[in-house]
Amino acid sequence: MATVMEFKATARPKSGKGAARAERRAGRVPGVIYGDNKPPLPISVEDKDLRLRIQAGRFLTTIFDVVLDGQKHRVIPRDYHLDPVKDFPVHVDFLRLGEGATIRISVPLHLKGLESAPGVKRGGTFNIVTHTVDLEAPADAIPQFIEADVSTLDIGVSLHLSDIALPKGVKSVSREDVTLVTIVPPSGFNEEAAAPGAAPAAAAAAPAAKAGAAKAPAAAAPAAKAGAAKAPAAPAAKKK
């Protein structure tokens, strides 16, 4: 479930590059609240506060109540821009969330059962195809992550998004069934040799092959004699 946190903001009476630079010199980051069929609302937030929330992780999947002049605006961050040289935030965008709103969002993928997977025990290696999953979820019930159990995967087997039970009200936005993870075989891996029971079967097949080879010439000999006996004698040549 989504956790709602408060974020204090101040209204920006002016817009434009000059006003934005003035906000940054004052230790604030310009931003905007938009969406829900309402006019954009220019704001600014404390630079230090914004940095801490970004560095804490999952910033773009966290719902906030932006407190502005005593009024709360339910929002979710949609984007933020960093200075290309000094790497500090220079702008932040918030999407206003109306009642009953649903949003599209990328959620981290967490895997469990990595060490107990049969494919790993046989020398295989996990290949994580994607680290995030694109979902559509209710704004008040955004999952912090999606968990996938890979404890039963064997070599050559893949886990897809359709194999996972998503939370109630959450669905995938991808048109295709997304491959999440596979187990790659080790170098020189022989599936038949590695299959359980392959060695006993091969051992049992060897004596049988030898016995068949020994019997083949014996069976061929009588057939050759019979062929010789049945062959008609060549007619004698007539004297002239």
UniProtKB/Swiss-Prot annotation:
Region entry Disordered, spans: 1-24
Subunit structure: Part of the 50S ribosomal subunit; part of the 5S rRNA/L5/L18/L25 subcomplex. Contacts the 5S rRNA. Binds to the 5S rRNA independently of L5 and L18.
GO biological process: translation
Family that this chain belongs to: Belongs to the bacterial ribosomal protein bL25 family. CTC subfamily.
SUPFAM superfamilies xref list: Ribosomal protein L25-like (SSF50715)
Name the UniProt record assigns to this protein: Large ribosomal subunit protein bL25
Gene Ontology MF terms: 5S rRNA binding; structural constituent of ribosome
GO cellular component term of the entry, any: cytosolic large ribosomal subunit
Covalent S-S links between cysteines: none
Gene: rplY
Cleaved signal peptide residues: none
Protein's job: This is one of the proteins that binds to the 5S RNA in the ribosome where it forms part of the central protuberance.
One Pfam family in the UniProt entry: Ribosomal_TL5_C
Alphabetical list of InterPro entries matching this protein: Rbsml_bL25/Gln-tRNA_synth_N, Ribosomal_bL25/Gln-tRNA_synth, Ribosomal_bL25_b-dom, Ribosomal_bL25_C, Ribosomal_bL25_long, Ribosomal_L25_dom, Ribosomal_uL5_bac-type
Keywords assigned by UniProt, alphabetized: Ribonucleoprotein, Ribosomal protein, RNA-binding, rRNA-binding
